[in-house]
């Protein structure tokens, strides 16, 4: 499932959607479309796909919670997995991407405490302990086929990669991060269309106010 099919569905159903859901999916689809048009530029595809994800999931929350954005992933994915009667996300995690997910979870370069230690914010032994703990938790989630927890951990790692690129911590088309960028982009290309489709299949759910609502000109 790709942009064209999802956009046709959006056009057919948007009149019955709540304004917030219609806006979220419209924005997310626009960035998915741009990612599909950026074949050959992996960095651009990753950026556009992350914006598509953010457009779909982000909510306007109190200022005190904005520093804990990563903690929001779990509740979002739990909602989607609970609504996924065809187990599409389960299939993606366990049948299509299980190998690359294990590689991502073992990659220290997309584990934020590693960089915090490198920048002198935490001791080296602390990041290593946290990395081992994170891997044990991830291994437990993998062993239990806990789709929600695995997706949440993976997206926290993707979020670190997103920070590296968006905040200028990476060179365009650099060979230094190609492996994780390839894996993350491939995963996003499959997960994002499914989550947009699930949201459109369940307009009765409360998806929350758009973080930046559309304001018509006076």
Predicted regions and their residues:
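Short, surface-exposed loop/turn segments at secondary-structure junctions
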Residues: 39, 64-67, 172-178
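Short amphipathic alpha-helical segments and their helix-coil junctions
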Residues: 22-40, 138
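Helix-loop junctions and short alpha-helical segments
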Residues: 1-20, 49-141
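Non-catalytic, well-ordered alpha-helical scaffold segments
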Residues: 29, 43-50, 74, 98, ...
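Short secondary-structure junctions and interdomain/linker hinges
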Residues: 39-42, 59, 87, 111, ...
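Polyanionic, low-complexity intrinsically disordered segments
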Residues: 4-15, 19, 117-218
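Short, hydrophobic/amphipathic alpha-helical patches that form generic packing surfaces
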Residues: 30-37, 47-58, 157
């Amino acid at each position: 499932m790709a942009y064209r099919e999802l956009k046709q569905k959006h056009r057919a159903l948007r009149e019955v959607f709540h304004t917030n859901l219609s806006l979220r999916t419209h924005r997310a689809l626009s960035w998915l479309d741009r990612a599909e048009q950026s074949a050959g530029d992996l960095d651009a595809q990753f950026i556009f796909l992350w914006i598509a994800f953010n457009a779909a999931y982000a909510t306007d929350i109190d200022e005190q919670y904005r520093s804990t954005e990563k903690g929001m992933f779990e509740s979002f994915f739990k909602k989607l997995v609970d609504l996924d009667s065809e187990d599409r996300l389960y299939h993606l995690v366990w049948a299509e991407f299980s190998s690359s997910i294990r590689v991502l979870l073992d990659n220290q370069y997309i584990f934020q405490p590693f960089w915090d230690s490198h920048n002198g914010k935490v001791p080296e032994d602390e990041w290593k302990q946290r990395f081992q703990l994170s891997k044990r938790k991830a291994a437990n989630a993998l062993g239990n086929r806990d789709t929600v927890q695995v997706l949440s951990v993976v997206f926290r790692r993707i979020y670190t990669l997103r920070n590296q690129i968006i905040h200028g911590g990476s060179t365009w088309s650099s060979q230094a991060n190609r492996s994780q960028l390839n894996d993350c982009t491939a995963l996003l290309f499959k997960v994002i269309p499914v989550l947009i489709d699930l949201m459109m299949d369940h307009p009765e759910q409360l998806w929350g106010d758009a973080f930046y609502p559309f304001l018509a000109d006076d």
